[in-house]
Amino acid sequence: MARRRQLYEGKAKVLFEGPEPGTLVQYFKDDATAGNGAKSGIITGKGVLNNRISEYLMLKLHEINIPTHFIRRLNMREQLIREVEIIPLEVVVRNVAAGSLSKRLGIPEGTRLPRTIIEYYYKNDALGDPMVSEEHIAAFNWAAPQDMDDMNQLALRTNDFLMGMFTAVGITLVDFKLEFGRIWEGEEMRILLADEISPDNCRLWDSKTNEKMDKDRFRRDMGRVEEAYQEVAKRLGILPESGNGDLKGPEAVQ
């Protein structure tokens, strides 16, 4: 097989040229970072689990007609995705106070919010992904008003669906981060959900104990990060085919 050309390497994933025009291969790494790279480490098997969890959730979203960049999983660490023009915004959906929201507003962590809150952050590691308003987004033309309407609608629909899915398996969806991209089909432009949905970009707490089951375990040096990710996969019924045995998985098939 011809070696694929690497196009981009981020903190948790690598993008390679896809087998067909308009496609990419997304490879999930075991690398973990926090504080925009200020803290880094390796969580063995994280890439394998995130690949499976994200595949499962993206396919479920497809079933309710939420468009995503996901096409299919290729192997334990890679999935085929549609190439999109990424909108330079992180869209954070919050149901329960935690993380930066608790710090900024002095709301005790774990307080259920009176309504779902959507926040926007400008994707720029050098600036620390600053929080921005819709006024900033419009002024700097990061996204058109129609793009924002589409992203907000998709974010809220995704939230409603995922909240129900996680509640059914005893997990509280505290908050999560989404990224979106544009794709052109002839003259028509559509907004798709991109990136991933996994314990790397969702805050997930056990519904009974509030035990953290996400990357906060790494951020806060709580330990048992791998076990937490495995527990999420187990509750969703999607551990790797080999079970817990080989979470390292193969290297990228290039």
UniProtKB/Swiss-Prot annotation:
Q: Hey, which family's this protein in?
A: Belongs to the SAICAR synthetase family.
Per the record, GO CC terms?
cytosol
Q: Which reaction does it catalyse?
A: 5-amino-1-(5-phospho-D-ribosyl)imidazole-4-carboxylate + L-aspartate + ATP = (2S)-2-[5-amino-1-(5-phospho-beta-D-ribosyl)imidazole-4-carboxamido]succinate + ADP + phosphate + 2 H(+)
Q: Mind listing the GO molecular function terms for this protein?
A: ATP binding; phosphoribosylaminoimidazolesuccinocarboxamide synthase activity
Q: Do you know which InterPro entries this protein is assigned to?
A: SAICAR_synt/ADE2_N, SAICAR_synt_PurC, SAICAR_synth, SAICAR_synthetase, SAICAR_synthetase_CS
The protein's Enzyme Commission number: 6.3.2.6
What superkingdom heads the lineage?
Bacteria
Q: Note whether Iron occurs among the keywords.
A: no
The protein's annotated pathway: Purine metabolism; IMP biosynthesis via de novo pathway; 5-amino-1-(5-phospho-D-ribosyl)imidazole-4-carboxamide from 5-amino-1-(5-phospho-D-ribosyl)imidazole-4-carboxylate: step 1/2
Q: Which Pfam families match?
A: SAICAR_synt (PF01259)
Q: Which organism is it from?
A: Gluconobacter oxydans (strain 621H)
Sorted alphabetically, the Gene Ontology BP terms of this entry are: 'de novo' IMP biosynthetic process; cobalamin biosynthetic process
Which protein is depicted? Phosphoribosylaminoimidazole-succinocarboxamide synthase
Does the entry feature the keyword Ribosomal protein, yes or no? no
Q: Matching PROSITE patterns, A to Z?
A: SAICAR_SYNTHETASE_1, SAICAR_SYNTHETASE_2
Keyword entries, A-Z:
ATP-binding, Ligase, Nucleotide-binding, Purine biosynthesis
